[in-house]
A protein has these predicted regions:
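Two-component system phosphorelay core
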Residues: 1-149
Length: 149
């Protein structure tokens, strides 16, 4: 295993250890094969596009007077589902808390959750972009992507 492969393996392991990713991400990786070598990247790219839109919608909805908590909850529910489907564990967890604040119609709690959600999402996005960059570098050298044990 060369330096880049080790770096990729360690980065991915850290994402799991730090709770950014869960087993659902591993399940996505198992669906990737020679016929769809960029499957995970494509799924995550769609997740990012949807998440960017949902976070914007939540931010806009929280700024409305009066606040429509049902609408915000629907956005948080959608974000929770898409996050869970790609294995974004920490984002999923914040969404669950966010939904509780929506149900309680706690505006300040919702605002804090949105900030936390944006923070967790930004961290995840940065870490996944780095993971994909390492994978591309490894492929460019004709090496195989190491699998997680």
């Amino acid at each position: 295993m060369d330096h880049l492969q080790r770096k990729l393996r360690d980065h991915e392991a850290a994402m799991f250890q730090q709770g950014f990713l869960d087993d659902q991400f591993s399940q996505l990786q198992k669906l990737q094969d020679d016929s769809s070598p960029d499957f995970v990247y494509e799924v995550i790219t769609l997740f990012f596009a949807d998440s960017d839109k949902l976070l914007s919608n939540m931010s806009h909805a929280l700024a409305q007077v009066p606040v429509n908590f049902k609408q915000i909850d629907a956005h948080a529910h959608q974000q929770k589902g898409s996050s869970a489907s790609v294995g974004a564990a920490r984002v999923t967890s914040v969404c669950a808390t966010f939904r509780s604040f929506c149900e309680a119609q706690n505006l300040e709690g919702c605002r804090r959750c949105l900030q936390q959600l944006q923070h967790e999402y930004t961290q995840l996005k940065t870490k996944l972009h780095y993971l994909f960059m390492l994978q591309q570098e490894i492929k460019a050298f004709g090496r195989s992507i190491p699998t997680r044990e």
